[in-house]
C-alpha cells in the first residue's frame, strides 16, 4: 500500500513567503531573551530565518517527512523534533514562535496560555484573531481570562499575499508576553477565570448592571462603565481592560 500523507494545506498551514514579514518576526524575537521554540516548522522558512540568530532553537513538526527534510537543511544548533504542538511543553523562559495553522488557532492559544514555562510568544494568526486577542475593537473572554498574567499586543497586519497557498483572509502578528509582576497571584487563576466567564455570559443592559449581578459593588461597577464609555452605546464586557477586570474581581 502506498504511503499517503496529507499535504501541508490539508494540515491547515499556509507557508509564509514574504521576506519582510520573516525579517519582522526575527526582529521581534531578537528583542526577547530565552531559548527559541517554533511550533509547526512546515517548510522551514521561519526556522531558517530564526536560525540566523545563533540561539538554541527547537522546532516541533507533526509531518515526519517535512521534519526529516528540514533536519538535512538546518544547522547543528537547531533541533527538529517530530511531534504534536498541542502536547509540547516549551522549555523554561522560552520564546515561542509560530505561524499558527488557522484551523488550530483556539486550541493552540489555550494550550500555550495554560503552559507555565515560556515567557514570550510571537505568533502569526488570522488578522481578526490577532485583533481580538489584543483587545483591539473589543476583547474576548479568553484574553480577559488571562490578562492579569499576560500582555497581548497587535504588531501589524500581514496580507494574504504573503502566504502560499494564499488564504482567504489576512494574517496578523500577535505578541504575548508573560507579566513579570502579575496583576493577580497565580492561585487566583481558576476563580478569576470562572468569574470572567460568568460576566461574559450574564445578561444586562450594560456592563455596570452585569458587574452588579456578579457581585461588584454598584458604585465601582458604575465607575468602571463610565471609565470605558466612548459613545451613547452601552459599555459591554468586551470593552473592559485588564485593570478593570482586576479591580472588579478584587471587590467581589
Predicted regions located by residue number:
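Catalytic cores of RNA-modifying enzymes
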Residues: 1-197, 222, 238, 243-250
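C-terminal lobe and adjacent flexible extensions of AdoMet/dcAdoMet transferase-like proteins
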Residues: 198-252
Amino acid at each position: 500500500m502506498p504511503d499517503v500523507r496529507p499535504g501541508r494545506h490539508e494540515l491547515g498551514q499556509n507557508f509564509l513567503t514574504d521576506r519582510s514579514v520573516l525579517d519582522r518576526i526575527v526582529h521581534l524575537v531578537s528583542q526577547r531573551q530565552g531559548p527559541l521554540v517554533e511550533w509547526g516548522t512546515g517548510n522551514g522558512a521561519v526556522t531558517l530565518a530564526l536560525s540566523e540568530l545563533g540561539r538554541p532553537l527547537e522546532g516541533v513538526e507533526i509531518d515526519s517527512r517535512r521534519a526529516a527534510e528540514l533536519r538535512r537543511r538546518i544547522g547543528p544548533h537547531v533541533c527538529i523534533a517530530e511531534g504534536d504542538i498541542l502536547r509540547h511543553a516549551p522549555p523554561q523562559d522560552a520564546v515561542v514562535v509560530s505561524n499558527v495553522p488557522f484551523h488550530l488557532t483556539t486550541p493552540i492559544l489555550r494550550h500555550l496560555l495554560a503552559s507555565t514555562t515560556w515567557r514570550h510568544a510571537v505568533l502569526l494568526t488570522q488578522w481578526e484573531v490577532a485583533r481580538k486577542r489584543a483587545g483591539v475593537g473589543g476583547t474576548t473572554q479568553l484574553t480577559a481570562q488571562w490578562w492579569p498574567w499576560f500582555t497581548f499586543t497587535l504588531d501589524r497586519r500581514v496580507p494574504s499575499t504573503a502566504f502560499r497557498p494564499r488564504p482567504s483572509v489576512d494574517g496578523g502578528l500577535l505578541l504575548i508576553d508573560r507579566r513579570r509582576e502579575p496583576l493577580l497571584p497565580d492561585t487566583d487563576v481558576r476563580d478569576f477565570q470562572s468569574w470572567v466567564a460568568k460576566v461574559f455570559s450574564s445578561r444586562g443592559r450594560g456592563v455596570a448592571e452585569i458587574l452588579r449581578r456578579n457581585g461588584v459593588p454598584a458604585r465601582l461597577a458604575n465607575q468602571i462603565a463610565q471609565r470605558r464609555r466612548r459613545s451613547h452605546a452601552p459599555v459591554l464586557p468586551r470593552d473592559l481592560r485588564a485593570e478593570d477586570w482586576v479591580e472588579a474581581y478584587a471587590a467581589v
